[in-house]
Structure formats: structure tokens, C-alpha cells
């Protein structure tokens, strides 16, 4: 196995930069950089490092050596903590590249080696990637649970039950003339039924884990000049949309990313949906607005308190569902009695975006819907499509199983189910999917 290295911290100015080296030559490389031979595993040393050929001083650093297998990758590993200087990073990188037998790591290669050395399964490796990319508290909770083996524990439990069924059935394949005892038949049938129901229910999760991982899309919908862009700017706490009293100012979809209650929200401000426009660009904006609303996880539909009759049109009303927040904006400009019937009919919140009236209620409603759509349960969620695909295949094989069929074929259905579950964790030969998973890691991880 080659020795690899990379800067694990972000490149640029910082208090500290961390370089990681993994492989059989790790300790030798550290000795070349420091001129010291007596490093002990798991002790931090304050050292000077130099360019091996010229002995030019690179930096005063902290170094630590982890002897195999007691390291992240399971190999000999060295970490070098330098000052976070671009110049130091460049000089040290060049010095390492000039040492024979060491090369720059590929994206995700350290984690890939850890997986190949049985430090964790594939679901945990994916959890580490999600942990690095997590931007909100809820994304962190989901990722840390997966990185710490909760998904592996769940899938391992299912796989163990499947292997138990296989072992019970295979004992009778070589003796076709013998009847399978009722106790064995009952155990196989009961376990099979429980697994079918459990995996079916698990797949019927409304993609909560994937929503939390990628972010919930929230579309702000309404007629022209109702205050959608002003609401977007309030939610983002900065101006990212042009605010104007001219109808049709927003002609395309404007996006912003937000953390509400720990949930990742992707905000979309859309073009106003109103009367038929003769402007081709505006027509396209309206078409995109309706499509955006139809694919959004959460919708905010805004009505104009001064123009309720024109605000409420069929295109907008048809978009209302259980995950829609309806609001009447500009309530400061009209008497409350004039909006009472509409407020009750569509369960609207009364707000004024311009004067910051009741806007906290919008945030609370967004958080409540997000929690309902992607809130936590005791059972860890499916977090990406790869898992879902294998689980659907597993369920297909599992439902095809029948003891009325040939025993060999019935056992093969269970074996294929176990293989699909195993593929999620990487306990079978999955070389073809490793590249796809680890290419999404950053260099140095």
C-alpha cells in the first residue's frame, strides 16, 4: 500500500493547519522532516521541520505518530500541525512530494482506507461525509448518529435475521425427503413476516432523512408586488432580492439558504402569479413559479390585504396543502374586519413585512412543518438514494420468498435479500460503488 498525504484542514490563513500522512512510510517521512528517530505512538511532540534536501526551516510544529492499527485509517499515521499559512502549506506540500514513495491523497482516500481496514462500514463512512457537510444542528444530529454506527446496527440486525433463516433452510436442502419441522417453519415464517413489514414501513418514510440531508425547499408564492421579496430578505436577514413597488420586478427564482430551528431550508422567491401577462419573460417567470411551488416541500402563500380580490386566484389557491403557510401581508394598511372572512377561510397569519408585525409567527410555522417532515425518531432514517435502492431490491426479493416454492429457490430469495442489505454496509464485494461514494469527500479526508 502506498503512503499518502494531504492537508486535512482548509487551505488558507488560519491559526493552525493540519497535514495527515498515512501508510507504511509515515514514520520514516516524519523522521526525515524532523531529524528525530525516537517518536513514540500517541504522544504529541513540539518539533522543527525542515526541507529534507536543503535543511531549510519550514516551521515550528506539533507532530503526533499513530502506530498501526490504532489510527483513523488503521495504518501508520502521522499528523503535522503547522501554523495556518499559505506559504507554509505550499512549502511543506512540495517537500513531501519530493520524498520518494509518498504521493498526494485522492479525495476521500483516508476514509476509504479506514473502511477497507474495517474501521467502520460504508454507512458510517457516508455519515462522516455528511458530518463534514452538515450546516445545521439537525443535519449534525443525523450525521453523527450515522457516523457512530446507528444505521450499521439497524441493517446488521436485519441481515443477521436473514442469515439465520438461510442457515435453517440450508440444513434441509441436502435432505429433500425429510419434512421441515413445524418449529423451524414457524420461526422462518414469523421472521420473514416481521422483516417484510419492518422494511416496508421503513421505506415508507416520506424521505425524511434525505430531506434533512439535502434541505427542505420553501417557495414563497403570491401575486405581483405582494411583498414576497421583502419577506425573503427578512428571512435571510440581508438583501438578496430587489424590492420595488413595480409589479413583476422578480422574473426568475431567487434562492437563499437558511437555518430555521436547526433545519436546513432552501428559500425560493418566485415571480408573481397574477393576471395573464403579454411579456414573454414574465410569462416564463410565472410558469417557473408554479412549477417551483408544486415541487416545494413547504410553501408560503401571500395575499395582499389591500387587494384581496385580485390576490386570490385559482392558480394560487390550488397550490394550498397541509404544508402551506398562508399569510395576509400589509395588515397595517386596512381594517381587520375587512380581511376576517378570508383569514378564517384559509387560516391565514396576519403580518406586515415592512413594519415587522407578527413575522416571528412565520418562522415558528416553518419550524413546525420542518419538524413534522424531517423530525427525529428513535430509528435512524434512510439518508441517501443508494440505501433506498438496495432496500427496495431487498424487499422485492423478500416478498418473492415462499416456502411453497422449491426450497433452493426460496433460500436464494433470502440470500439475495441479505446480499442487498450487505451491499449498503459494504460487507460484500462492492468495489464498483466505492469510487462513487468516496469521490464526494474532500482531499485530506
From Swiss-Prot:
HAMAP family with a match to the protein in the record: GTPase_MnmE (MF_00379)
Cross-referenced InterPro entries: G_TrmE (IPR031168), GTP-bd (IPR006073), GTP-bd_TrmE_N (IPR018948), GTPase_MnmE (IPR004520), MnmE_dom2 (IPR027368), MnmE_helical (IPR025867), P-loop_NTPase (IPR027417), Small_GTP-bd (IPR005225)
Broad class of the protein's primary localization: cytoplasm
Binding-site residues, (6S)-5-formyl-5,6,7,8-tetrahydrofolate: 20, 79, 119, 445
Chain positions recorded as K(+) binding sites: 225, 244, 246, 249
E.C. number: 3.6.-.-
Binding site for Mg(2+): 229, 250
Gene from which the chain derives: mnmE
Cofactor(s) this protein requires: K(+)
Protein name as it appears in the record: tRNA modification GTPase MnmE
Top-level taxonomic group: Bacteria
Domain TrmE-type G as annotated: residue spans: 215-371
Pfam families registered for this protein in UniProt: MMR_HSR1, MnmE_helical, TrmE_N
Role of this protein: Exhibits a very high intrinsic GTPase hydrolysis rate. Involved in the addition of a carboxymethylaminomethyl (cmnm) group at the wobble position (U34) of certain tRNAs, forming tRNA-cmnm(5)s(2)U34.
Subunit relationships: Homodimer. Heterotetramer of two MnmE and two MnmG subunits.
Family: Belongs to the TRAFAC class TrmE-Era-EngA-EngB-Septin-like GTPase superfamily. TrmE GTPase family.
Compartments where found: Cytoplasm
A GO cellular component annotation in the UniProt record: cytoplasm
Cofactor binding note: Binds 1 potassium ion per subunit.
Sorted UniProt keywords: Cytoplasm, GTP-binding, Hydrolase, Magnesium, Metal-binding, Nucleotide-binding, Potassium, tRNA processing
Gene Ontology terms describing biological process: tRNA methylation; tRNA wobble uridine modification
Record: residues binding GTP: 225-230, 244-250, 269-272
Broadest EC class assigned to this enzyme: hydrolase
Molecular functions (GO terms): GTP binding; GTPase activity; metal ion binding
Amino acid at each position: 500500500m502506498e503512503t499518502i498525504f494531504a492537508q486535512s484542514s482548509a487551505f488558507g490563513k488560519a491559526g493552525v493547519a493540519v497535514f495527515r500522512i498515512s501508510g507504511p512510510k509515515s514514520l520514516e517521512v516524519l523522521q526525515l522532516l524532523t531529524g528525530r528517530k525516537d517518536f513514540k505512538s500517541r504522544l504529541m511532540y513540539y518539533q522543527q521541520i525542515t526541507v529534507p534536501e536543503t535543511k531549510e526551516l519550514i516551521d515550528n510544529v506539533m507532530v503526533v505518530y499513530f502506530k498501526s492499527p490504532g489510527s483513523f485509517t488503521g495504518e501508520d499515521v502521522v499528523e503535522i500541525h503547522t501554523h495556518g499559512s499559505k506559504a507554509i502549506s505550499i512549502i511543506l506540500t512540495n517537500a513531501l512530494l519530493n520524498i520518494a514513495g509518498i504521493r498526494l491523497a485522492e479525495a476521500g482516500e483516508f476514509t476509504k482506507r479506514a473502511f477497507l481496514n474495517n474501521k467502520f462500514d460504508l454507512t458510517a463512512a457516508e455519515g462522516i461525509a455528511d458530518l463534514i457537510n452538515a450546516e445545521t444542528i439537525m443535519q449534525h444530529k443525523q450525521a453523527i448518529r450515522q457516523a457512530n454506527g446507528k444505521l450499521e446496527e439497524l441493517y446488521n440486525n436485519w441481515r443477521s435475521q436473514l442469515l439465520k433463516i438461510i442457515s435453517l433452510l440450508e440444513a434441509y436442502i441436502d435432505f429433500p425427503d425429510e419434512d421441515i419441522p413445524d418449529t423451524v417453519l414457524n420461526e422462518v415464517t414469523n421472521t420473514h413476516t416481521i422483516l417484510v413489514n419492518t422494511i416496508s414501513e421503513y421505506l415508507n418514510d416520506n424521505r425524511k432523512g434525505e430531506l434533512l440531508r439535502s434541505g427542505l425547499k420553501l417557495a414563497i408564492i403570491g401575486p405581483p408586488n405582494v411583498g414576497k421579496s421583502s419577506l425573503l430578505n427578512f428571512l435571510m436577514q440581508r438583501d438578496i432580492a430587489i424590492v420595488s413597488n413595480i409589479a413583476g420586478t422578480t422574473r426568475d427564482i431567487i434562492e437563499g439558504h437558511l437555518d430555521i430551528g436547526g433545519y436546513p431550508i432552501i428559500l425560493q422567491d418566485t415571480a408573481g402569479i397574477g393576471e395573464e401577462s403579454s411579456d414573454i419573460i414574465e410569462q416564463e417567470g410565472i410558469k417557473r413559479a408554479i412549477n417551483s411551488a408544486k415541487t416545494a416541500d413547504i410553501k408560503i402563500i401571500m395575499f395582499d390585504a389591500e387587494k384581496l380580490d385580485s390576490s386570490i386566484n385559482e392558480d394560487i389557491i390550488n397550490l394550498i396543502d397541509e404544508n402551506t403557510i398562508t399569510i395576509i401581508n400589509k395588515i397595517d394598511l386596512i381594517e381587520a374586519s375587512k380581511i376576517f372572512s378570508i383569514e378564517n377561510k384559509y387560516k391565514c397569519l396576519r403580518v406586515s413585512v415592512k413594519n415587522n408585525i407578527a413575522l416571528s409567527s412565520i418562522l415558528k410555522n416553518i419550524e413546525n412543518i420542518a419538524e413534522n417532515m424531517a423530525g427525529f425518531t428513535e430509528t435512524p432514517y434512510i439518508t441517501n438514494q443508494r440505501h433506498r435502492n438496495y432496500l427496495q431490491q431487498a424487499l422485492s426479493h423478500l416478498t418473492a420468498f415462499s416456502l411453497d416454492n422449491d426450497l433452493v429457490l426460496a433460500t436464494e430469495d433470502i440470500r439475495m435479500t441479505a446480499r442487498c442489505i450487505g451491499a449498503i454496509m459494504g460487507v460484500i464485494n462492492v468495489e464498483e460503488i466505492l469510487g462513487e461514494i468516496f469521490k464526494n469527500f474532500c482531499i485530506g479526508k
